[in-house]
UniProtKB/Swiss-Prot annotation:
Domain Ig-like: 1-114
SUPFAM superfamilies attached to this UniProt entry: Immunoglobulin (SSF48726)
Pfam families: V-set
Native species: Mus musculus (Mouse)
Misc. remarks from the entry: This chain was isolated from a myeloma protein that binds phosphorylcholine.
Name of protein: Ig heavy chain V region H8
This protein's record includes keyword Transferase: no
Lineage: Eukaryota, Metazoa, Chordata, Craniata, Vertebrata
A GO-annotated cellular component: immunoglobulin complex
Length: 123
């Protein structure tokens, strides 16, 4: 069974930092692109970061809203995806999800999602 389990959310003051984790199991972690997506209260899902697979040297990509503040990384020995979040702002308040990126039927889609972890940025 493929599983993604996020953790590390919580309440943090503006300007603070948090590190989210996404523990994965049931698939070969190094073979897949992995993504971080968030949903602010009352808003749509927003893609924020990607970690490409081993074949693509685990290169990363970020949305403009988090670039320079957030860092996505992997622990390949433990099959964990991380999101280091720095200089947090009130607008970063959201439920954060990790997702597996899958290619099938000639297009890419997120086929497995975690349940999410909540981040609240407030003084």
């Amino acid at each position: 069974e493929v599983k993604l389990v996020e953790s590390g959310g919580g309440l943090v003051q503006p300007g603070g930092s948090l590190r989210l984790s996404c523990a994965t199991s049931g698939f070969t972690f190094s073979d897949f692109y992995m993504e971080w997506v968030r949903q602010p209260p009352g808003k749509r899902l927003e893609w924020i970061a990607a970690s490409r697979n081993k074949a693509n040297d685990y290169t990363t990509e970020y949305s403009a809203s988090v670039k320079g503040r957030f860092i996505v990384s992997r622990d390949t020995s433990q099959s964990i995806l991380y999101l280091q979040m720095n200089a947090l702002r009130a607008e970063d308040t959201a439920i954060y999800y990790c997702a597996r990126d899958y290619y099938g039927b000639s297009y890419w889609y997120f086929d497995v999602w975690g349940a999410g972890t909540t981040v609240t940025v407030s003084s």
